């Protein structure tokens, strides 16, 4: 029929076993179903193509004019009201990260001792910039922290509030591009005693005008430690995580995929670092970084 010619072809039949549901409480699920039901009545007869209808590509495009912007927020000094100590050694981290990301082709900007409002403002403005000619975006947060929180010089703010500016529905020029966040901060007060292990052997996309992707897609969060634990920093050398990250990026930043890079960072922090403190409660402790990836493709900085 003529009316069907402009409709995108439906490539996959609906599952006859039933409709998709949500993992929510019964009261929330019924509300969501009601909302979705209303939307269905008003929906166009033309099906919207989803990402699974496209020919898959497994590498992020990096052939843009620029690699992208890298913002480093380096919080060293804190207002007395926060009760937080000076983060000695963080300037070493900021300097090493500046050189490292610049060598990868990023336009790097460092901001020191930012308030919570300043951090929000910086990242909001960055998300409003035109990233059309950039391959990706990176941000490094160096500060004190708690689980899901990061300290500005004057208090704490949720990490989610900082990163949400770059969601797909808010920052359109970074849509389907990697948004990388590296976070050097404590995530709790637990200590990792480690466990003795036996030594062993060392072991271009086609245009498609109508499809949707999740707004939280294409994010990567690389945390210096796992939820609930301290993150260690040496006053003379910088934090363990940043030392390892910069070392691996210098060695393999242009030839390994990002998850391979971060896996090697995990290994280096786990094997090569151990705390040395006069206080026996804090002596001989270990640390393991943690990454949370919503990336949808492989990322190579050197391609």
Swiss-Prot record:
Pfam families membership: Peptidase_C14
- According to UniProt, residues marked as the site described as Cleavage are 36-37, 45-48
Where found, per UniProt? Cytoplasm, Cytosol; Nucleus; Secreted, Extracellular space
Q: Where is this region: Loop L1?
A: 76-87
Residues where Phosphoserine is found: 30, 239
Modified-residue entries (N-acetylalanine), positions: 2
Q: Source organism's superkingdom? A: Eukaryota
Q: Please name the SUPFAM superfamilies in this protein's record.
A: Caspase-like (SSF52129)
Which residues lie in Basic and acidic residues bias regions?
A: 10-27
Q: Which residues carry this modification: Phosphothreonine?
A: 173
GO cellular component, as recorded: cytoplasm; cytosol; extracellular space; nucleus
* Annotated region described as Disordered, given as residue ranges: 1-27
* GO biological process, any: positive regulation of neuron apoptotic process
Subunit-level organization: Heterotetramer that consists of two anti-parallel arranged heterodimers, each one formed by a 20 kDa (p20) and a 11 kDa (p11) subunit. Interacts with XIAP (via its second BIR domain); inhibiting CASP7 activity. Interacts with BIRC6/bruce. Interacts with ATXN3 (short isoform 1). Interacts with HSPA5.
Domain note:
The exosite polybasic region mediates non-specific RNA-binding, acting as a bridge for RNA-binding target proteins, such as PARP1. The exosite is also required for interaction with non-RNA-binding proteins, such as Hsp90 co-chaperone PTGES3.
Name recorded for this polypeptide: Caspase-7
Source organism of this protein record: Mesocricetus auratus
> Organism classification, top ranks?
Eukaryota, Metazoa, Chordata, Craniata, Vertebrata
Gene symbol of the encoding locus:
CASP7
């Amino acid at each position: 029929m003529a009316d069907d010619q402009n409709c995108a072809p439906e490539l996959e039949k609906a599952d006859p076993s039933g409709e998709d549901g949500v993992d929510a409480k019964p009261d929330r699920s019924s509300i969501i179903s009601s909302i979705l039901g209303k939307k269905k009545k008003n929906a166009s007869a033309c099906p919207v193509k989803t990402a699974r209808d496209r020919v898959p590509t497994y590498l992020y495009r990096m052939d843009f004019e620029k690699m992208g912007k890298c913002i480093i927020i380096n919080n060293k000094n804190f207002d007395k009201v926060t009760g937080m100590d000076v983060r000695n050694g963080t300037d070493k981290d900021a300097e090493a990260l500046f050189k490292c990301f610049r060598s990868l082709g990023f336009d790097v900007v460092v901001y020191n001792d930012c308030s919570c409002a300043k951090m929000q403002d910086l990242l909001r403005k960055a998300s409003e910039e035109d990233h059309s000619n950039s391959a990706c975006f990176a941000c490094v947060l160096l500060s004190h922290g708690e689980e899901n929180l990061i300290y500005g010089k004057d208090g704490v703010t949720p990490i989610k509030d900082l990163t949400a500016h770059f969601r797909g529905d808010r920052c359109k020029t970074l849509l389907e591009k990697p948004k990388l966040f590296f976070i050097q901060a404590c995530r709790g007060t637990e200590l990792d005693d480690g466990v003795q292990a036996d030594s062993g052997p060392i072991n271009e996309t086609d245009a498609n005008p109508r499809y949707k992707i999740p707004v939280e897609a294409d994010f990567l969060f690389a945390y210096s430690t796992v939820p609930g634990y301290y993150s260690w920093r040496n006053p003379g050398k910088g934090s363990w995580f940043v030392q390892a990250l910069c070392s691996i990026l210098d060695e393999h930043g242009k030839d390994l995929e990002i998850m391979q890079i971060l896996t090697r960072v995990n290994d280096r922090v786990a094997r090569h670092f151990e705390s040395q403190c006069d206080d026996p409660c804090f002596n001989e402790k270990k640390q393991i970084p943690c990454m949370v990836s919503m990336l949808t493709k492989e990322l190579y900085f050197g391609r």
